[in-house]
Every structure is written in C-alpha cells, then in structure tokens.
Amino acid sequence: MGYHNVKYGKKAQRRNYSKTIYDVDLPNLIEIQNQSFDWFLKHGIKELLQDFCPIESYNGDLKIHFDDYFLTPPKYSIEETKIKDISYVAQLFVKTTLENVLTGETKQSNILLTELPLMTSTGTFIINGTERVVVSQIVRSASVYFAGNFDIKLNRTIYSGQVIPSRGAWIEYEEGSKEILYAKLDRSKKIPLSNFIYALGFDSKEAIENVFGKSAILDSVFDKETDMDSDNALVELYSKIRQGEKVPVDTARDFIRTRLFDQKKYDLAKVGRYKFNKKLDVLTRAENTYLACDFVNPENQEIMIAQDELLTKEKIAILKQNRHFLLQEIFDAKHNLENETDEEILAYKKYPQKNELFTKTNIINSRTGEVLVAKDTLVNDDIINHLRHNIHTLDEKVSKFFLGTKDIYQKEADRQGVFNEILEVYTSKDESGKLYNKVKLIGNDQRETKKHITLSDVIASINYYLNLYENVGTVDDIDHLGNRRLRLIGELLKNQFRIGLTRAEKNIKDMISTSKFGEVNGPGDLVNFTFLMSVIKTFFTNSRLSQFMDQINPLAELTQKRRVSALGIGGINRDRAGIEVRDVHNSHYGRLCPIETPEGPSIGLITSLSTYAKVNKYGFIQTPFFKVLQQDGKTTLSRDIDYLTADQEKEEIIASAGFVLDANNSFQDKKIIARSNGETGIFERNQITYADVSPKQIVSVATSSIPFLEHNDASRALMGANMQRQAVPLLIPESPIVGTGVEYRAAKDSGCLIIARESGFVTYVDAQKIIITKKPNQTVSLNGKTLYDTTQEFTYTQAKVLYENNHKEYQAEYTLINFAKSNQDTLVLQKPIVVLGEHINEGDILVSGPSTSQGELALGRNVTVAFMTWEGYNYEDAIIMSEELVKHDVYTSIHIDKYEVQTRELKKGSGQEEITREVPNVGADAIKNLDERGIIIPGSEVKEGDILVGKITPQGNIEPSPSEKLIQIVIGEKAREYKDSSLRVPFGEGGIVQSVHYFSRKNGDVLPAGVNENIRVFIAKKRKINEGDKMAGRHGNKGVISRILPKEDLPYMADGTPIDIMLNPLGVPSRMNIGQILEIHLGMAAKKLGIKVATPVFDGVNDYDLKEIMKEANLEPDGKMVLYDGRTGEPYDSRISVGVMYMVKLSHMVDDKLHARNVGPYTLVTQQPMGGKVQNGGQRFGEMEVWALYAYGAAHTLQEILTVKSDDIVGRNKTYSAIVQGTQLPKPSIPESFRVFIKELQSLGLYVELIKTDTKENEVNKSLIDYKKEGYN
C-alpha cells in the first residue's frame, strides 16, 4: 500500500501518498516576526540606550543618563483601535537621571521616549486602524569582500577588495592603470596602496617589508620617486577625504582615528565582527599550502608540524588549537594608530606592576597660571573632582583626557598594541618535489570582539588582497547567502531608533549646555524626543518595508509575513538591479524559494522564505538537515537535526531527499544523489554527512501547496503560487480534494484563525464567543461543597459545574470576528468548528475563518472539468461555466465597502455642517430608509445615488440676526440657506447596509481638528460569478469566463452528470503544466471514493499510485470518457479528459473594472475627459486608434473624436444644444489643448500668430467666447 491516512488537526483527514518514512513538522511559520520583535523589546532598546548614554554638555558640567525603560499597557484593545482608526501602541518611558558633574547632585524622572507600535500575536501592526506588516529586508552583510575580473588586455585577473561595515567608512582596494594598486577610504579619491600602508603607522619601506614580507607585487606598489613616511601619508589621506584641505598631522591622525576606530562613527555590529574574523582568519587561507618553517611550541620546543608539510584539515586543526603561538605584535601600544599619541596622554604608569596613574606634567589654570595639580601626582577621584570644579579654566587637551566620557584607567586598560597571526607558507610544488613561491600570510587577531574595525583587521585585509595576486585566498560571490543576511523587524526598528536618537542627542546637548542645574526641575525640562517619534511614525506609515497587509486570504497573509525584500533603505534600487542579484543561486536551497517571486520589475528582488527556513542571531538564513552517522561500515540517518547557514553547508556533502532507508534507518543504495558546495552529483554513501529533512524544504508555503509541482514548468508554477494569493474568500469554502498536506499548517499559522491557548472543555459556544474551561491545578470548593478534586479525572461535567459557578480564573474566553471588513474589502467571518462538551487540546483550531474549512486552507472549490472546446468560446484560455455554479452560489463572495462622511466646523460666522433627515429638495422616497438622525438604517438595501447619511451645509458666511433666526425657526425655510451635501452611494455601487459606526466629539471620541462628527457606513454586496471574472487553477492555468451556459446545453457524462467547467485543451501542451492533468484524474478518483488526498511536492502520487487509485475507483486508465452534447444528445467523436480540479476565483472581478461614461468631469487645464472608473472617466483614444480611423478614411468621425468629444469647449456645448433641439450639428471650434500648446510656446518667449484665413486677423489672444454672438452684454 503506497499511502497512509493522516489526521490534520481534529477535523480533517487525508490519504497521504508521501514515501518518506520520516516526517519533520514545519516550524511556526511566523515565528521570525514575533521572535525578532521580542528581541527588540528586551535587548535592542537596552543596547541603543547604552550606546547613547551618557549625553554630556559641551562644557562637561551636566550629564544625562538613561538608566532603564518600561512600556505601559496599550490604552485600547486591538478591536477598539480598528474601530476608532487609531494605532495599537504602548508608551515607552525611559528612567532618566540628570547629573551635576561638579557637585554630584542628581535629579530623576520618567520621560516618554515614544509611542511604540506593538506587534499583535499574529505578527502584524495596527497603524491608524489598519493592519500592516513589516517585511524582512535582505542586504549585503558587513564583511571583507574580494572580487576578481579577467582582463583580456593584461591576460590575467585583476582584483579588488572592499571592507564594508554596518555603519561607517568603507575601505576599498583596486588596481589602476599601469598595474599600480590603490586604496580609498570613505569613497574618497584614491591614493597609492603604499601610502595607505604608511598611514597605518609604518615609517619606512623596510618596516613594511618586515611585516608583509618581500614580494614582486609589494615592490610594484611602492612609488620609487618620493620619500614617504607615516605623517606625510596621514596628511595626504586626510587631504583626499576632505577634497584637498591641508591640516597638521595631529589633526589628520585624530580625524582618521575617529573615522575608523570610534564606536559611535564606525559600527560592525555582531555580524560584522563574526564575518571579519571568519574571512581574515589566516588558517582558512593556509589550507592546502606547505608550511615554510617548523611550527614549534615555544614552551617546550616541541615541533608540532614539520617544515614543508602539507597543511591538511587535520594539521589546520592542530594550528587552531595552538593559534596563540602565531600571534606577533606589529605595533606596540605607543605606535598604535587606534590609541592617543604620546602628546595627548597626560598620565603614566610610574610602577608597571601597580594599576596607578600619575600626572605627566603640572596641570595649570590657563587663566591665572596657577598649578592645580602638580607633576607626578596620583590620579584618584579627588583629583578628578578637583579638575571638574575648575573645568572652565583647563586647557582643552587636559579636560578631554581627564574628564572625557571614558575613565582614564579604562583608557589605559584599552590601550594595547596591534597583534596579528602570521604564517609563512609555500603555495606550489614542482615535479621534482621542490617547493616554491613563498608567501607570508597575515590574519587578524581572532581574539578580537570589538564592534569597530581594528588596525589588525586593516593589515590582515591588505595582506589578503596582496595574497590574491599570489594565488592564495578566494574571491567572494556577493550573491551567495553566506554574504547576504536578513534585517528582521527588530533590527529595522533598532536602526530607526538610532536615527531618531542621533537627531535627539544634538538637541539635548544644546539644551543642557545652555541650562543650569539649579534652574531645572528635572531631566524632563531638557530632554525632547520629538525627532524619535517622528522617525518611528514615518517608518510605519511611509517605509517601503511597512506594507498594507494583504488580507484577501490566509495564504496571502502568511506569505507577506514570510516575504523577503531586497528593496528599501540600504537595499537595492529596482532600476539598477542586474540579473545576477535577481537570479536563483544554489545557496538559496532550503532558504529562499526559487519559484515564488513577482512577475515584472521586482522579479528576483522580492522572494519568500522556504518552508523550514529559520534566521540565526546574525541574520543569516538557516535550513535544517538530518545528521548522517558513519558507524560499523553503515551509513545511518540520525534523527538529530542541525540548522546550517549557506556558509556552513559549503563543507558538507548533503543527500537530497528521496533516498531509500531500511528498517534500521540505514541507506540502502551505495550511490546517493547529493550536493557538495552547491553542485549536485552522485557520491558514495560513506561520504554523506547530512541529509535533507523533507522534499518540500526547497520551496515556500504557497509553492508547496501546488500538487504535482514537479510536473509543471517553473514559470507556470510561479503564476500558480502568486495567483493563489489573489483568491477571493468564497461564501461556502471547500478544502481541495487533491491537496499537498500543508493546507492545515498554512491556515493555522496565518493568523486569521483562533487557536486554543490551553487545554480544557468547551463550556459555551455561539457565533460571538467560545469559552473553554481548563483543568484547575488545585481543589475547588464553593460554600463547603467540593466542585473539583485534583485526585479525580477532569470531565466535562466538572468543567460545566465550574462554568456555571462563574469561576472565571479557570475560563478562557475567545471572541469571534463577525462581519468585519478586511483590508481588501472582503468579508471576514469566523464560525465555530467546536461543539459544546468537546475536549480541546492546546494549539487546536477553534473556528473556521475566511477561505478555511475544518481548519484547512480552502481558497476555491472542487469542480468537474472537461478539457474540450465548445463553439470557440474557450478561445485564448477563456472558460465556459455552468449556470448551476451561479445558482448554487459555488463561486459567490461577499464584499464590504466603507463610506465615510464628516461634519465640520466652517469658517467663523458660517455655522457648521449638520447631520439631518431634513435634506432639501429631495422626496420622501429618498429618505425613507434614514433614521430620525438622518443616518441609514442597517439592513436597508441601497443602490447607486441613494442617500446614506443626510448632511446639510450652510451657504454664505453671514450670521443671521436674532429676528432672522426666529423667522427661520417659525417658517422652517432651511432649504434656501442650506445646500444638500449628503453622502450618497457612488456610481456603480450598492448592496445591503451591514453596519453604521457613529463618532462624535460630544461623546468624547477623538476626532481630527475641526471635525464634529464622523459617520462610517459599511455596505455588504453579494457578488455572484459573472462573465468577465478571472479564474485560475493551482498550476498557472488562468482564464476569463467567456460564457455561462444553462445546465441543459452543457456536455454530460454517460450517467447524466453535467460538466461544471470547460477548459481549452490547447492551454496545456505549450504551457507545460501537466500537473493539472494529473490533478483532474486523481481528483475524479478521490471524489468517487469519497476521500481527500495529500500528494506532497516532489514526494507524492507517482504513475503507479495513480493507476492503482483509478483502478480502485473503477475509472478508465487514461482518465478519458465519452461525453454527450447537451443540445443534441449525441456523443462527441473523441473521448475527453474529465476530472475534478480545484479552481479559485481571483480578485480581478469584472464588477470592479466594467465601466462606461456618457457625461462626466474634465481635467482643468486641457479640458479633456478624465480617465479611470473612479473619476467616471472616458476611454483613451490614443495615437494608434487615430491611425485606425486614418486607415478607414473616417474623416468626420475622427474630427468629432478629436474636438467635440474631447476638448472643444465651445463646440461640445453647441453640439449638446443641437442634439437637444434637433438641429444640424455645428462645425467644431479650436480644441483647448491647442490653446494650451500655444500658451506653452508663448511662455518660452516665442511670438505666435494664429491667422484666420478669411479675415486675416491674428486670433491667438482672442477670447474663447464671442460675447456679442452669444448674446452677452
């Protein structure tokens, strides 16, 4: 038997045809969103505040410290924020201390940092009442990158390098003309690489060669004509960065040091340090080279690796364990560019063994010359306080050194030399066995944990670059996922916070520098975080990564939360992105879906995470693999799972899913299809180190829901995955007969269903709420009577007793969503799928929502399909449908539209707008469905033009006198002073009023300035499927309904069953999506057997299984049958493929698009008709359409279209009058666009004449209307 029955949740069961004997559950599909936001709340904010703490005044008198932070609970619930159109936020407060440095006094207060939008449990944010999703961004990781391009002229490869931080100045290496190597700092002009090396602290060519070793490539770097040293090189480097500006060497050194080695200006982040240490590790380059000298343990003189030995992986492992012996000091602390110079250091260690610092010189009062602190005085807290009290009289150097942000003892501890790991190797061996090409390899200090770049890193990167010319080291593939990482919501928010806090920091510094401690009540008077609030608000409302949630169905919702975009701030520009960055890369395997991406300009730049993908702490995407063990000559699959990044995967040989195992989990085949370093091949089973966990780990959730995916062309699979996300929720959802097994998890994790938070019994259920009573963890009594004893088994009877006695602490209440409007104007309705007394486990699905059935994804309906033509109506992929599907609401959907009206306070003296039933100049019939306030009654049926809310606006701005007011009240002559500004149903709309929301300033509702009342009317419309609606299958087979036939005209089977849908058979072979044919055969068999089937992607029903199930269902082996013409009753000549296909109705509906105009608005300048359905516009008659009329010689029609039907203002009014009066149509006048053209020429200073042929007059400035002729005075 090639299948097994599997239960999905409690309600759904399928016959699963998966061949894999192991089944790894999918991880929570939206956990990356929730986990990242939680990290930001717990750690991200804390790290940021530490980076900005303390903020010090310019004179050093006052400091502001951020001690801690806390969030207040949100003011409104999620439901309330949606109704009131406000954001779901919590106030973020920071505990702030203002310190008087001179006296040590402090003042504390809690200050509002910002209103922080909170993530809901489903991974969304609610901003201004609408749900939004922040998608993850994929960017190039901070690291050191090298690239090589073959130069045809030079007949060799030229290399370039980039040292890229997360934030800060880039260092770039490149080869210029005449084979000279150059360096650039911070995108400045380039300088010779030799000068850049000098600037790092080397004083002579000999010093450089002593570190880097002698080599031909290094010799070519030096400019032999000039004498260069460290100081001159620093000044030159500064000059290149600052566009030729010349400064003293101390200023240049200080500037370069700040640019590269200051944490505030240069940030690698954790990921940058990890990647730097990985790339610049000397041992990575040394593998497969020959050691140039003995590797000796200096402690016992033991030779650990002999000279000339090949450095294999085993030898490299020995070096790794003893890598501290490779460290050499390049610069001591005194000459390290990262440290202050001798002139800047004003304290020294008198006794090396003691941690005590003494002043180098006398510290004097710069105003009076008085000695404040004598030379050789021990620096302690008293001395520092004494200097603080005299801060205004100190020299700038003194105050910077002793009273800077860093403690001087900490500075001394941090002042270290530059250490690098150095190894000399031979790279080549000739035929005689002689080694040659000696190369010096320099790696960075692997102990380094600093978040900024170090001199050790820079030296190692230069050496790596030079090594490339000696064939040591590797170039990087920037499109490899080992070099690209995800910025999740937590990191994106942290970056925005940094921008906001940086702007706020300057403002705070200015405030505290102009304030005195005694004059302020607390830090709240000095601190203003308006900049931060503005940045956060802008990010959530305007950023390309913060998107309006695609709420049309659960799959669309889930896919958007797992979406990965390369666009946005710090990402790729869509217009400049090449093919390489868009293309599928072998490192995407199991991490990014190679199928699901948009068609059009964003192709390849927006992708989706694969089903099992996770993101590690550095932002690199991981995918799981089973460990493979080699034991007793057998290759065994372990159940231990490792999550590997693309970099970690490089070294492994990974078996592709589909391998055959025996009962002991050992591989049966000697040769296994596997991947190594991205390439697929056949390997011996004893070489395998890992194995895929599932065949579907390659693709995304949307793609894995396509059955028989392996039989479809990739471009059609892409369309299938994308179109499923456009499926409209149907009135009666139905899960697919032929599924893939992911439908349950996709629906559960999407966020549109209610999941039980704990186990228990259902003690109350209706359409509004579900109550689950859970098992108490202690004995429960009431009035001496025991309601539940922990020794007893917990039953429904006991749960009911607890519920009836109102024990709320043991009850969990779940509120269902009823008739809500989604972001895409579709209906959101949740219905209970549990019954009273049912036992529920934690994690069970309690309700079915839009496009779900029994807890499974249900985007469409299972319909009987025949691949045949019918009178040419299914030409070009058109679809012919049965009228029965329309009658029985098979593809009917409900849509809800929102209409809004506000009453405003008008200008002074003009009064205010009013909501009223007394609408002027309308009959009683127009207001029959309005209540006494003038608002439509819910449940009323409305059509276009009907009044929804009666509103009147005063005309004129004259305030009536008291006597006039009295007359108006007595006579009631409102109609004369008020105009009708009621909210009406727009053109082409209508339906049933579902609900009305009324907000008023009087009721305490928060409304925009000047608005007194706000009324929202929701109209529900039932849309039956219609000709012109777009439908699709799951295989990219899309089409538009061309004809809906009555049941009696449709072809029928031998048993009289009519066909539901007819598809064009020509749409299959050229599109190469054969999956749809297999689906209809399997669907027909499963329907006859009364079962549902799961055929997982790459691991489902094969030819043998399909034949067996068709035999079981008594169907023909080829799936074809004789059909009879419904009109004549005669059989068709050929047997026809008939089966059951799952087809969805897409959101491209004809009701939204069909539109016609007779009269309507015109654009102001050109006076041509507006365009589009929203503006009630006309159809564009473009250049090519004009050519068509040329071709027919239809001169009068053409003239009419280009004049009176377009922008001839006078002509169209005269034509209208002529049609009404029945007179002859007049000649057209000059079109308005021609007048606009003339005005544009005149605006350029050109003299334009328009000479009338009969009168010879210049009519260029003549008025549009002949007043005399028209009868005007």
From Swiss-Prot:
The lineage of its organism: Bacteria, Bacillati, Mycoplasmatota, Mollicutes, Acholeplasmatales. This is DNA-directed RNA polymerase subunit beta. Keywords: DNA-directed RNA polymerase, Nucleotidyltransferase, Transcription, Transferase. Belongs to the RNA polymerase beta chain family. HAMAP family: RNApol_bact_RpoB. One of its GO terms (molecular function) is DNA-directed RNA polymerase activity. The gene is rpoB. GO terms for cellular component: DNA-directed RNA polymerase complex. The RNAP catalytic core consists of 2 alpha, 1 beta, 1 beta' and 1 omega subunit. When a sigma factor is associated with the core the holoenzyme is formed, which can initiate transcription. Disulfide bonds: none annotated. It is an enzyme of class 2 (transferase).
